[in-house]
């Protein structure tokens, strides 16, 4: 069972990520991280009749590949925790329909992967699940249609805008065994510093990431330099700079910060402006880039902070400000699972 210190839940016997998988689309196949995806599609429709159906197919393929890599089947999964950006999380719901698994849909916007890992770790630690799938996805075309403008409109993108990844990532969690351990989880609190620009999600989300990291460090009495990497979800280039500035104002100079949204694409070569975004962005970078490094013991302790902007199409049209949240998961290489200060 987990123990609580402030807002942070610590697992004396860390649940493990027994297997993971990530699949991307055409732009991801042209990215610097292309070789780290398990599979890539040159057709972003994935042979489906609509973009929305394509995203469902992306989740289905990723979930099944994750189970295959674990030599498991749907019968070995107690619960599916999944989410996406579509209204009412329809990509996840339709994928759950096809998988036939017990399903709890989650929505934390682009923070959903960390949310799913955190909730899943709690359930595994409490003995409520023997095998649990945590999964998120996003699709550039579904997100553009829902939150911005139709693709055929040809709107000019601002320098602060980010490119929603067409990608999905899935992790199979187990209460114990071989795999990267989840040692601690900090569920974030909603932050809102008054940003209204839907084309500057990084600025809206940076305060949430800073607040959650500061709370975790206080709860666990740790320092940033104790970790090989502090990895945010999709702040992008603009949001990452603001994140570091906010922490510098609190006396913390981060030298080990990386951002999934900054890593995924070549900002200039792929014309993505401030970087990548979407629940599939951090899920894919986690499953294809971060977890393998921990498994190879190239890194030993990593903080994974996914961030999400909690607005909707309606609140944007009503000119509301953009609230944001960030959830943190501490990941440890297999031999580090029961060590450290936490």
Labelled PLM ranges:
Residues 83-88, 110-111, 136-142, 188-189, ...:
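Acidic, glycine-rich active-site loops and adjacent beta-strand->loop/helix elements
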Residues 93-96, 235-250, 314-321:
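Short glycine/threonine-rich loop-to-helix capping motif typified by GTGT followed
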Residues 1-52, 150-214, 219-222, 252, ...:
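Condensing-enzyme catalytic core mediating Claisen C-C bond formation in acyl metabolism
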Residues 55-71, 119, 204-219, 285-290:
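Short, well-ordered amphipathic alpha-helical segments that serve as non-catalytic structural scaffolds
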Residues 208, 214-246:
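Long, repeat-rich segments with strong aromatic
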Residues 106-134, 173, 277-298:
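Active-site-proximal alpha-helical scaffold in enzymes
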């Amino acid at each position: 069972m987990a123990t609580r210190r402030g807002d942070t839940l610590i697992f004396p016997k860390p649940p493990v990520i027994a297997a993971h998988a990530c699949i991307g689309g055409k732009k991801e196949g042209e990215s610097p991280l292309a070789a780290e995806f398990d599979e890539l599609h040159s057709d972003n429709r994935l042979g489906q009749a609509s973009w929305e159906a394509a995203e469902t197919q992306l989740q289905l393929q990723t979930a099944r590949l994750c189970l295959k890599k674990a030599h498991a089947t749907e019968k070995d999964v107690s619960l599916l925790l999944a989410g996406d950006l579509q209204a009412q999380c329809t990509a996840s719901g339709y994928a759950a329909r096809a998988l036939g698994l017990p399903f709890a849909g989650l929505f934390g916007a682009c923070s959903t992967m960390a949310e799913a890992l955190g909730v899943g770790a709690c359930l595994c630690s409490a003995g409520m699940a023997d095998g649990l799938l945590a999964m998120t996805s996003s699709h550039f075309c579904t997100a553009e249609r829902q939150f911005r403008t139709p693709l055929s409109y040809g709107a000019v993108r601002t320098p602060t805008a980010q490119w929603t990844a067409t990608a999905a990532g899935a992790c199979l969690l187990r209460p114990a065994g071989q795999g990267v351990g989840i040692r601690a989880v900090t569920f974030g609190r909603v932050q809102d510093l008054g940003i209204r620009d839907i084309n500057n999600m990084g600025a809206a989300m940076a305060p949430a990431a800073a607040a959650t990291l500061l709370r975790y460090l206080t709860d666990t009495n740790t320092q940033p330099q104790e970790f090989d990497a502090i990895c945010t979800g999709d702040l992008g280039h603009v949001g990452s700079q603001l994140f570091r500035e906010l922490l510098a104002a609190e006396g913390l100079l981060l030298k080990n910060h990386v951002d999934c949204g900054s890593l995924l694409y070549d900002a200039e070569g792929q014309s993505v402006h401030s970087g990548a975004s979407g629940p599939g962005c951090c899920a894919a970078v986690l499953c294809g880039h971060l977890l393998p490094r921990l498994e190879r013991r190239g890194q030993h302790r990593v903080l994974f902070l996914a961030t999400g902007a909690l607005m909707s199409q309606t609140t944007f049209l009503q000119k509301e400000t953009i609230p944001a949240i960030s959830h943190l998961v501490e990941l440890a290489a297999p031999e580090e699972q029961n060590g450290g200060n936490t």
